[in-house]
């Protein structure tokens, strides 16, 4: 929950190319490799192409995201060797697929559980180097030697968490824009959501659950039958240590293209 997958999404969006995401927990068995490059002759599914080779053939310029790579079968790593070395992969029909214009990103939580444990020794507040040790244990040297870089993600600071809260509120406001509903988030409310929903061990994922519980659910009834049925402004504030929604109903709200996506509250 520190933004590994989100980085790949934003990279593809910035470059304006397709994002191909594969959840590698679906490829834990040895026979699952045939789903990536296709089944050999005589086996069921031979007439169907491999998921990986077909998608890259359709989108030669793309960001290829292999999520949770440590959960895949070790034989999958062997397939990726020629992709990282020569930029090509041969499917079950002998067709060579070009990977030279593909940005390959692999995410992993290897070493995260060891990193979360308390540090041992004087003057140490957290463990260091556990992630590199876990990567060396899971992946063989020939695989690691073909990687351009190994980037370790640290815990998110509070400044970043506040930006993540704004992002979730922006997404909610975009969903409600066709209903003429605008959301104003005060600074105190953003800090309340950040403190309530962020955990060092769990990352930023609990934030969405806090927003679901304290903002989306209370708004649902007002959107259907209440004050927001014909649009309005929702001001999210805090009162007595709790989140409070101040709803102002309007018959018509003109939304201009120049309006900032997140209105600052007074």
Residue ranges and their predicted role:
Residues 1-266:
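AAA+ P-loop NTPase nucleotide-binding core of proteostasis motors
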């Amino acid at each position: 929950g520190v933004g590994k997958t989100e980085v790949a999404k934003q990279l593809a969006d910035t470059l304006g190319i397709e994002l191909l995401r594969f959840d590698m927990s679906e490829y834990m068995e040895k026979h699952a490799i045939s789903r990536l490059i296709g089944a050999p002759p005589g086996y069921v599914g031979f007439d169907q192409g491999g998921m990986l080779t077909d998608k890259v053939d359709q989108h030669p310029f793309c960001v290829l995201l292999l999520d949770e790579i440590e959960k895949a079968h070790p034989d999958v790593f062997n397939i990726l060797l020629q992709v990282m070395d020569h930029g090509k992969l041969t499917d079950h029909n002998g067709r060579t697929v070009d990977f030279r214009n593909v940005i390959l990103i692999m995410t992993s939580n290897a070493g995260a559980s060891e990193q979360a444990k308390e540090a041992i020794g004087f003057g140490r507040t957290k463990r260091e180097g556990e992630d590199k040790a876990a990567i060396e244990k899971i992946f063989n040297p020939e695989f690691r030697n073909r990687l351009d870089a190994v980037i370790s993600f640290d815990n998110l600071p509070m400044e970043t968490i506040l930006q993540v809260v704004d992002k979730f509120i922006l997404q909610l406001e975009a969903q409600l824009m066709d209903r003429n509903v605008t959301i104003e988030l005060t600074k105190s409310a953003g800090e309340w959501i950040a403190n309530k929903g962020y955990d060092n061990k769990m990352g930023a994922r609990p934030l969405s659950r806090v927003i679901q519980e304290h903002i989306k659910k209370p708004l649902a009834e007002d959107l259907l039958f209440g004050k927001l049925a014909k649009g309005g402004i929702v001001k999210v504030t805090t009162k007595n240590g709790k989140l409070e929604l101040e709803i102002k109903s309007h018959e018509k709200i003109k939304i201009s293209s120049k309006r900032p996506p997140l209105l600052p509250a007074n």
